[in-house]
Amino acid sequence: MIEIRNLDFSYKKSPVFNNINLTFPQGCIYGLLGENGVGKTTLLKLICGLLRPVHGTVTLDGLTAHDRQPEMLQRIVFLPDEVSLPDNSTPQRYVDELMPFYPNFAQGTFLHLMQELEVEPDRKFKEMSFGQQKKSLIAASLSLGTDYVLFDEPTNGLDIPSKAQFRSILSRRLEERNTIIISTHQVKDVENLIDPIVILNSNAVLLDASVQRIQQKLFFEYGGEQRPDALYSEMQPGGFLNVVPNQTGEESQLNIEALFNAVLRNKNIIREIGLTPNPSPKEKGTAADNETNKSNQ
């Protein structure tokens, strides 16, 4: 389990997070959403230990992320949006170099995924398109046998068939021990894949809830007139899509783009209906926190 407690983080004097708390249990594919610049990538880097909190803790099964112990590192993989790849290397050489650090790497899985994604494992990266390179890295990431997989904009550069393949592969490969976090602004690409959903904004967590809980609290009405009580309305073919508080308990089809806009425009209402996590009292900094604070200044 990934646990984030009382997390503060800033780049010099620019605050990114202020006392946020999140828990990512295993067995789920989480959607991490937010406008550009709110800290989605920063949060992924904090989770895998590439950044240190100013205050608070980030742990994976009790191991402190920024300590980057080998026991933790072999259980987590982070795929950034862009990766600098050696022109003359190949996907097979790439995983050969990673193999010693990941004892659960499965060569057969890698080759199967490369075949499914229609990329040749021995083709040089310089001969590939950006999308082919991205598919190679996705195949590699899912072959390392880690419990935790962090994706930053994984569908960037993928064509429509490849996006469908990505969704299919991820849904099939999710196991009870896995936690997958997808940070993206292309929500349509992962709309039927992610559950729960986390939305970040202005140093805080605006929403942290399962799809079922969102549907209990909000109703998505399709094809009607624009409603004055709507948290968000959007004209679509056949009428308006309205997002309104769910007063009847009736279930509706979630639209993540509409949800995102409704949350950003109605922060207080989203908090009142119980979709925003309650902030916990900030604990006094420990000696480790103070040392971390110094290293970030």
What are these regions (language model features)?
Residues 33-35:
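The feature captures the beta-strand-to-loop junction immediately N-terminal to the Walker
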Residues 78-136:
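ABC-family P-loop ATPase nucleotide-binding domains
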